[in-house]
Amino acid sequence: MQKQKQELHRGLEERHISLMSLGAAIGVGLFLGSASAIQLAGPGILVAYAASGLVMFFIMRALGEMAIQKPVAGSFSRYARDYLGPLAGYLTGWNYWFLWVVTCMAEITAVGIYMGFWFPDVPNWIWALSALVIMTGVNFLAVKAYGELEFWFALIKIVAILSMIAVGLLMIIAGVGNGGIATGISNLWNNGGFFPHGLKGVLLSLQMVMFAYLGIEMIGVTAGEVKNPQKSLAKAIDTVFWRILIFYVGALFVIMSIYPWQEIGSQGSPFVLTFQKVGIPSAAGIINFVVLTAALSSCNSGIFSTGRMLFNLAEQKEAPQAYGQLTKGGIPGKAVLASAGALLVGVLLNYVVPAKVFTWVTSIATFGAIWTWAIILLSQIKYRKSLKPEEKKQLKYKMPLFPFTSYVSLAFLAFVVILMAYSPDTRVAVIIGPIWFLILLAVYYGKGFHKKNAAAASERNIS
């Protein structure tokens, strides 16, 4: 048995982590999930994205404050352990693993929907299984090669979004693709007003809007594999937030200006529908390919995250020790395979309930994400309070307007959970989420993890 501590390789650069986080966040939440969110809120969805984006900015700043001072793999699980206690770290680590498994189920479900554009007679589950096998293989590449591939995956999405925004603006302003007749932006208020379903519609859309931001915290997961984390993480956090906000709000502004919001259905991506409206039907296939790569990319990031989180849990002796083993290339191979194995449930759901699986899994993933984001905020509050006055002055990357922004962000997250319980479509998440935590608690106390942690704490105090 090898006794020396195995470590993940620091092979990721700033451009990799910026684009990986961007790639993880810009997945089916924007390309497919935005359709159902638009139906709930109409053009008022722009307000929901902007407000949620501001809260996500504060959450990312809270994570950055800790990650820049203490960059480790599986960062927020480790911070929860250090500042909120071993149980919080255990729950957060396993919860993050679970939420990305569920998120990847949404992504591979989307792969099936997008492939149906070309192959309508092939069942969704076949494409879901194919995507899972391919993305698992990609995760066995050396971390630098993986980062490079994900960089280009994300770049394809970004170019597509910017192209769509540019073409859409030309149609809005100059009527390009619409017989020279400028569409203007009157569609934003001509079809029942800017808030056609009132404030209630905007509030009910928040679950899908928050799901669209899931993945932005990936920067924290990469902290243990980043070169020069102090410099890279700060820049990546700031740039990723603004890019995502511009892409989301900008893209949806163009979509709803060109296309009456009530005509944007859930039969396919709003991006494909938008290009068809512009008068370039041949572009629909290209855009469908782009959104297909978006789903694959986000699933790719998810398998990356789950593997690293299992590795971290194994290091803490709260997951099977085999998951703490690395391949020669520095990849937590067994942890990656275990995560991919769990994703087979998503393939099964695509076979059994293909019509309902997307809404179910996005709701459950959002619930898990809200726990993670809340833990980041609570850890940062405890972390800041634990610092001596001189240490607070030395912080290189501070949470702005602390503690006000931390508590307001926590209240916002709690409000979204209440809304999820209110809506019949998303209520399943508020039922399954607590059941999952009860299972984790049963394992924690049943396996005696609480005694091991107490013994370890007492040893540290003695030494």
Swiss-Prot record:
Keywords: Amino-acid transport, Cell membrane, Membrane, Transmembrane, Transmembrane helix, Transport. InterPro entries: AA-permease/SLC12A_dom (IPR004841), Amino_acid_permease_CS (IPR004840). GO terms for biological process: amino acid transmembrane transport. The keyword Cell membrane applies. PROSITE patterns: AMINO_ACID_PERMEASE_1 (PS00218). It comes from the Bacteria. This is Uncharacterized amino acid permease YtnA. It comes from Bacillus subtilis (strain 168). The gene is ytnA.
